[in-house]
């Protein structure tokens, strides 16, 4: 065992990154450390040569199946090999001085573009080679006194799985082109659905709106209320808010669609029946355009004013402060009665109208490019049911990626649980985009 292990250590490319004091452990010292019956104490010291090397390796067995399957795709392998060769060629060209200044600038630009991809690809290649050598070593460990070492290797593979998953995910994230709207602010609208009694939908709408408000605070975004129409028993008919910050649309673009709830109502008329009710509410996520992106001609607008509706307030039902905008060319209608000032309500309504017009432009672009994804129900198919909140079973299910979360109350807090689901949706969307790219590549080759 010592002979094989020493050969593997000195051949391993990751050895250069390890401190020399680990390399020159004697065989007897190595055997005493590796066969310690208290591996947790040994791992805490982190002085074991195998542990140090495993920390720089990646397993191929238990990583995320979708990501791993994509990485093993022949078309993706060929694509990455070509990119890596191009990067190596550019690297050699830039070492010469024969190119003129214009060509050199173009080469530098392309070289910088490929550098992150090439770095991740080369790291994966080295890691897989190290794993193959490690697996070969493990096959030779068949003696009884080496059983504990095999168990130790098995434990450390769990850490390795996380690393290879992270590396594959990083590669896919760099390969997928970023949407130009991802960094936009958004206008988020929620609207209660209809069911027997109606109370369950309105209560659920308020909970979902509060969830996204809390999520905005969790992500350190700015949450600006634009419209809020309350219902009886603390429910909510409709609400809209502007959310601004870092990559807001990127994180919220897959939240648009129909959210379904299944629960026994606690308040309202429906609570008298004491049985499970099913209701829905809709979420619309609109990227907020700049002034230059969407221009609205005042001649295309019809402005109606009316008295605000709602509970309480001296301005309610006393002045025509509420505003309704009708965009004549498209037929879009926007109302706002949030502010006491008619002028402010008109500004808010115009902002929402521009966002909806901008959304139509985005949908048109995606249809023309034929790259709309199934996950993008927030922009392509608002009528699709994307998620179910089953209170009786304490479970949240996202139907697009078959993802389940327990503890609904924790999920509705709009913090870590929601953020984890959103990250999974983003990753699945990237994987789907890569799959479409690979399918197109194979068809073009045929």
From Swiss-Prot:
Key words, A-Z: Methylation, Mitochondrion, Protein biosynthesis, Transit peptide
Residues bearing PTM N5-methylglutamine: 314
GO MF annotations, alphabetized: translation release factor activity, codon specific
GO biological process, one term: mitochondrial translational termination
Motif GGQ, chain ranges: 312-314
PTM remark: Methylation of glutamine in the GGQ triplet by HEMK1 is conserved from bacteria to mammals.
Localization in the cell: Mitochondrion
Gene Ontology CC terms, in alphabetical order: mitochondrion
The family this protein is said to belong to: Belongs to the prokaryotic/mitochondrial release factor family.
Recorded domain comment: The GGQ domain interacts with the peptidyltransferase center (PTC) of the large ribosomal subunit to trigger nascent chain hydrolysis.
UniProt protein name: Peptide chain release factor 1, mitochondrial
Organism: Mus musculus
Gene: Mtrf1
């Amino acid at each position: 065992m010592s002979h094989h292990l020493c050969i593997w250590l000195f051949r391993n490319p990751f050895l250069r990154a390890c401190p020399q004091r680990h390399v020159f452990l004697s065989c007897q010292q190595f055997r005493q450390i590796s066969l310690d019956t208290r591996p947790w104490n040994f791992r805490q010291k982190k002085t074991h040569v195998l542990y140090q090397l495993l920390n720089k390796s990646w397993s191929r067995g238990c990583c995320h199946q979708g990501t791993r399957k994509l990485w093993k795709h022949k078309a993706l392998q060929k694509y990455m090999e070509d990119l890596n060769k191009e990067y190596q060629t550019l690297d050699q060209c830039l070492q010469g001085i024969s190119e003129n200044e214009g060509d050199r600038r173009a080469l530098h630009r392309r070289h910088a573009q490929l550098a992150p991809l090439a770095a991740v690809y080369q790291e994966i290649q080295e890691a897989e080679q190290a794993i193959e050598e490690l697996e070969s070593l493990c096959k030779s460990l068949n003696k009884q006194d080496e059983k504990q070492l095999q168990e130790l290797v098995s434990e450390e593979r769990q850490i390795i799985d996380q690393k290879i998953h992270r590396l594959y995910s990083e590669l896919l994230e760099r390969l997928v082109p970023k949407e130009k709207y991802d960094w936009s602010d958004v206008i988020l609208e929620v609207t209660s659905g209809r069911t027997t009694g109606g109370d369950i939908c309105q209560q659920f709408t308020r909970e979902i709106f509060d969830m996204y408000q809390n999520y905005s605070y969790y992500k350190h975004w700015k949450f600006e209320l634009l419209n809020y129409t309350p219902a009886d028993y603390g429910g909510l008919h409709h609400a809209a808010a502007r959310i601004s910050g870092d990559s807001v649309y990127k994180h919220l673009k897959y939240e648009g669609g129909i959210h379904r709830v299944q629960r026994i109502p606690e308040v309202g008329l429906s609570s008298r029946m004491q049985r499970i009710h099913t209701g829905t509410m809709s979420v619309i996520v609109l990227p907020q355009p700049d002034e230059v992106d969407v221009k609205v001609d005042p001649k295309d607008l019809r402005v109606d004013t009316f008295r605000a509706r709602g509970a309480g307030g001296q301005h309610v039902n006393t002045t025509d402060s509420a505003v309704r905008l009708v965009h004549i060319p498209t037929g879009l209608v926007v109302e706002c009665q949030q502010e006491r000032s008619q002028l402010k309500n008109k500004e808010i309504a115009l902002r929402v109208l521009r966002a909806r017009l901008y959304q139509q432009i985005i949908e048109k672009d995606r249809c023309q490019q034929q790259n709309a994804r199934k996950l993008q129900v927030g922009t392509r198919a608002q009528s699709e049911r994307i998620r179910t909140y089953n209170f009786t079973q304490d479970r949240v299910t996202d139907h697009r990626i078959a993802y389940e979360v327990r503890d609904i109350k924790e999920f509705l807090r709009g913090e870590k649980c929601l953020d984890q689901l959103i990250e999974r949706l983003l990753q699945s969307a990237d994987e789907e985009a890569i799959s479409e790219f690979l399918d197109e590549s194979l068809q073009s080759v045929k």
